[in-house]
Structures are given as structure tokens and as C-alpha cells.
Amino acid sequence: YSPVEGVEIYEVIRKRLFENLGDERIRKEVAQSYFDLYQKLGTDIPSEAKEIEYRERIEHSYPFHPELIDVLYERWGSFPTFQRTRGVLRLLAEIVADLYNRKIPSPLIQSSLVNLENQAIRREFIKHIGNEFESVIAADIAGKNAKAPKIDKDMGSEYATYGIATGIATSVFLYSFSGAARKETTLPRIRIALLREGIPSTIVGDAIGKLEEELWYFHSEKKQYAFRNQPNLNRVIVDKEETISDLRIKEKLYESIQSNCGKAFDVYLWPEIASDIPDNKSLKLVLLSPEYAYNPEESNKRASEFFEKAGTGFRVYKNTLFVLALESAQYLNLSKSLKRFLAILE
């Protein structure tokens, strides 16, 4: 037995998986449309994708994008357990069935369209790299609580239509494993894995930034991207945040206000009773405790009390008093920011 090499692998896959690929004219048109797209992208994609030979590779690999077959054959195929051609055929058969069942429209089957939420497909990858990567996929790439699909949903527009964040995360995952040394990918490669007609090329860099900010196992270094089973800084910070108590947040807020309030007013932070605020001609700024942010009625009641009373009597210099209270949404955002700040300091 001698392994299949080069363009020959595309022919083997075509014959094994499909009895009939339809009109050859369609195949050539699809190859030409991708080739035209790649000419427009210039240096944003690998140089070989702009060569005539690459258009021919697309024709040979149709309906798969050659990049998908290459990453499976060259990277995943380097695992002794993968069985190269057999492994590629097994995986692609599952991928085709999944796309057919989901009625996903695309001229070519690209890496970004591989559905890692499909358990049969997922198992084909996991069995070569270890069960610990189940949690990586579930946290970041595919599943009801995964972060990449949530980014697509929250961003809407092209993100939601084409599954941009999920597609990029999936493509990077496929590039992250190999029996050899290379275990990452680059932005130009990611564009090849994702872009097709209708997807703006500029969205890729923006989406990568969002993955870097929000995913837990997505690692980037010197414009190289990969998934690892070690958490990145985002996850470390989230773990630290869980140890930060509400009391500590409140104490930090008190300390920050106290050190930044200036001298234009006499400042009174979170007074409990009216007698905590003197009745004199000095300008006074009163900040109500954060607890009042969630109870506007009680907040108004307490502010009125401070205006009316001073100790056991009535307040004379009401016009020197200013009372501020946080709104609940403001305090919620402020608390989140302070929690993250304290977590980073640890």
C-alpha cells in the first residue's frame, strides 16, 4: 500500500463519496468565482491561493475546498490513529451528511462549515486528541453555552447569517492539531477557510479580536492562532472574578470615590442618618449607598430625609446640599468593571 499524494487525494475522495458531481460547467464556474475573489484580496490571503494552479485544485477538490482536505490530510493525517485517506473519507462523509441535513447553502464545503456540535463529527476529532478537548469545544466553539455562537447571535447581521465567529473558531480548531510541530494558523489561512461570496473580508480581523476578548481556550501569539486545553488570560480572570465578593467591590468603590472626589464640596459617602451630614453653609455632596440603586422609592425617601432633617431638628441650609444616587444599570456595569479590575490585580 502506498499513500495517496497531492491532487490525487482529491480524485480519490470524489470517486469514493460521490457517484455524480453534476455539470462540469458548474464546477468550473465555482472555481473561477473563488479564484476571482482571491485576486481581489491581494496580500490578505496566502500567495498560492492567487495562482492558476489553485483554481485547478478547487476544480479537482469540488465540492470540497482544497484547504479543508489539506488540513485533514496533512495535519490530522499525521496522527498514527487517523489512517490518512480512510480517516479523511470517514470525516468528510459525516460532514457532507450533516450539511445536507441542515440544508446549508455554500458553493464549496469549507473548514468553517464543519459542525462540531454534531456528535459523530466531534468524536472523529476527539478520539485523536483526547477527551479533555470536549470541554474546550463546549466552552468556546459549539453547543448551547459556547461563546462563539453567542458572539454571532449578539452581533447579528453577517455574523448571524454566516456564523462568522463560530466558523473562524472551528477553522482554527482544525488547524490546532497535528502529529508534527505546527499547531496553529494565521489570519490569511483563516480567510481562506471562511470567505466566500457575500462575506466581507474585513469582518475576519474584527471577529478575531472578539474571539481573543471572549473565548477561554483561544490563544494568539505573534498573529498565530490556536486552541489549547490550557485556559487563556480571559479564563484566568473569570476564575479570579468568582473569588471577589460584593463587599470587596463596595469597599473598592468607596476607596476610589474617596480618593478622587476633589475639594470643591464636602463629600459624604453613604451616610446612614441625617445627623451624619452637618447643617452649615459649606457646599455638601452626598452619595447614597449602592444598595439604594435597586430601590428608587427608598432612595427618594432617604434623599428627602437628608434635605429636611439635621440631627433632631430641621435642616436650615438645604440649598447647600446635593444628593446623588446610582441607577441600577449604572451600578451593575460599575460592579462588573470593578470586579474585573480587582481580579486582574490579584
Positions of predicted regions on the chain:
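Extended alpha-helical scaffold and adjacent linker segments that couple domains
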Residues: 1-346
